[in-house]
């Protein structure tokens, strides 16, 4: 927040005037969001919450950082918008009611919680059946390699099955923010945990941040060799009935 870095830049006036074009270029929210109850998991520092409110949504923003929430409130008040802000971790939504939200938008933030499956269970509880969850996550390899390449290329120096918080980044930057504690979540947790929590994954994209002409050692150069994030659209499923079963090849006919 203090440095005004890539992930804490407040929305500019021209962005506030076309919020869905900026935040939802793929149309995953389904168009008009007037009066929709939308939860933002991670404030984005004066960005997602105020922009969605400017598009007509009733917005709640959750973030563990009071400074990030302050940026949201300041921008919302300057625009005459209503944005509810709650200081808590994304894996503790106990203050929110069950099935309260029709949609959830989450910028990159699951890397800051130790148990992503717990965060997904909390998310499932507060979402309405049929609600859409749009999120970005750091993919595992993004947290396994350093920013700068060696003469032989990029080197994986963190085990895939690493447990606990990651060591501080050797070269802090957009791929590893300075002053944060991050956790590596494996694909089985990122995707499998989401399905187990009661979601159906409908779409997966890899936003492009790479530039082959960028200076080696830069975020853009690294992004050309490794997509740093995945973006998901998932649907909160109806609660399954007690009679439903899963057929497997070993099941009796």
Predicted regions and their residues:
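Conserved alpha-helix/loop element of class I SAM-dependent methyltransferases that forms part
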Residues: 6-36
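Class I SAM-dependent methyltransferase SAM/SAH-binding core
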Residues: 36-93
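A short acidic, Gly/Pro-enriched loop at the edge of an enzyme's catalytic core
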Residues: 91-104
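A short SAM/SAH-binding and catalytic strip from SAM-dependent methyltransferases
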Residues: 102-117
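A short glycine-rich, Lys/Arg-flanked "PGG" loop and its adjoining helix->strand segment in the class I
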Residues: 117-132
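Conserved class I S-adenosyl-L-methionine
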Residues: 132-169
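Acceptor-substrate binding/catalytic loop of class I
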Residues: 141-145, 174-189
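Short alpha-helix
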Residues: 181-204
